[in-house]
Amino acid sequence: MIEIDTRIHDRYSIELKVGFVTRKKLRMNDFSLAMWFFVPGSLDINRATYPKDMFYQDVKSNIRLITPVFLLREIVEGPALPLRNIREAFIQMASNPTRTLISEYEYQIKMFAAIVKSALRDELAHIKQNRIGSDTETLCDGFIRNAGKICDEYVGLRTIINAPTVPEGVMRMYLSGDEFICDITCKHILELIEWLRGRKLDELAGKATALYRRIGKHMRQLGYPEIRKDDRLHNRIFIHRFSILKKYIESDLYLRAPKRRDGVIVEQLYFSIAAGLAMLFATVVSFAFQKKFGSLTLPLFIALIISYMLKDRIKELMRYYFAHRVGSKYFDNKAKIIHKDTELGWLKEGVDFIEPEKVPADVMTLRNSSHLTEVESGNVTAEKIILYRKSVHIDRDKLQANSEYSFSGINDIIRLNVTNFIKKMDDPSVLMRTLDDDGSIQTVDCDRDYYLNLVLQYQYDNTAEFKRFRIDLSRDGIKSIEEVVG
């Protein structure tokens, strides 16, 4: 299964979180993803102005394991795996702080904090999407209670490692996890408070506020920074610190994927064939003229010059032909997906400009299914079409090896910076005039936007699915991303 989530990452970047979820009973899992970008022709994006190297500079891809899924109540109630694992790691490390046990202790801190972060996010999203009004109070009360219990349970672990056998640096690992859990819990509690107040659920908002203040008191006691009103310098440090903490906590989930060119051996083989055929042509011409006119004659001399001129052209033309064939069959880059020195699988990626007639009918039908104007429906051919494709292979057995947790797959977090797309846009606003009801002429400031259409074609287990998104852009950056239902 492939799960796709889109959002605006920043003013000039869109983010696609692509989850490649493996089947439990299938060892080898293969996925394919094609992203069709329909770019307005007025932006002057084409092969000459936007080569492959520039596209890959604009695209950033992070590969990471999908965080194991637990409910908040599962983390704090009964024999919960995350809490049990972290407690056992703390006890063993405190008794015998060897390098191996310290490494396991740090790993369990990171996993526990990452699992809590995902659980808070998912349950808050569920509360907001809940349509059964009578369940709202129970869901919110459970969220507040369980979030508070998780913080208390983690704080209680400190007594296990606050021992003379534990080095100071090891305690700092614990405190980093504590600070991150406090920060992320407060962030989601604030979001819940705002949501509750908007629905006049003041009693629940009061409970959430009490938890927020309790966590804040704990943070101040341990010297963790908090957001302060009218203190930009302090808040700058807070943002930087939180960003570093987030990277530290999630570092064990990220996978290495060193890239290299795909199809290099086949490409060189084709190029060698091209050189050989060109040389064969020159040799045949040389032998033919030598046989007819003899050696050291003027006709032979002229024939040799012409044959070598044509040989180089034939060689280049055949190199171009073979390169096109290799490019259509192979990808630009290939990377091994590696976690803790274990190769979990591989991924391939490729990008190219595609002519409209070569776009699959299903993709073009979805692109044409909804237009903002009638004129646009006949103007699709003026768009430039970029195809970015990925192929992913995952070995599920290796994915599950050497871990107490069950990982369902990997996330490929793709960020596309659109700075090169907006270089040739007109000003973001234009002054237009209209006649008011009283007959006066009014000047109105109007937005000038451009629309980038993205069609996703993803395939797994012989099943193909499609999604379309409309990205609203202006000279000032990205305004919105909306899914267009065909």
Regions found by a protein language model. Give the residues of each.
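Soluble regions of membrane-associated proteins that transit the secretory/organelle pathway
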Residues: M1-F242
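Hydrophobic transmembrane signal anchors and adjacent membrane-proximal interface regions, especially
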Residues: I4-T6, I14-V18, L33-M35, E349-P356, ...
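Structured extramembrane domains adjacent to transmembrane segments
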Residues: F20-V21, D30-R73, V363-R475
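A sequence-level detector of short, solvent-exposed, charge-rich linear segments
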Residues: R131, K329, N333-D341, S370
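Membrane-proximal, non-transmembrane alpha-helical segments
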Residues: E194-L277, F281, R468-S474, I478
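Transmembrane alpha-helical hairpins and terminal membrane-anchor modules
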Residues: V264-A335
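Acidic, Ser/Thr-rich low-complexity segments on the non-lumenal side of membrane proteins
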Residues: K340-V380
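Acidic, serine/threonine- and proline-rich intrinsically disordered appendage/tail regions
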Residues: S480-G486
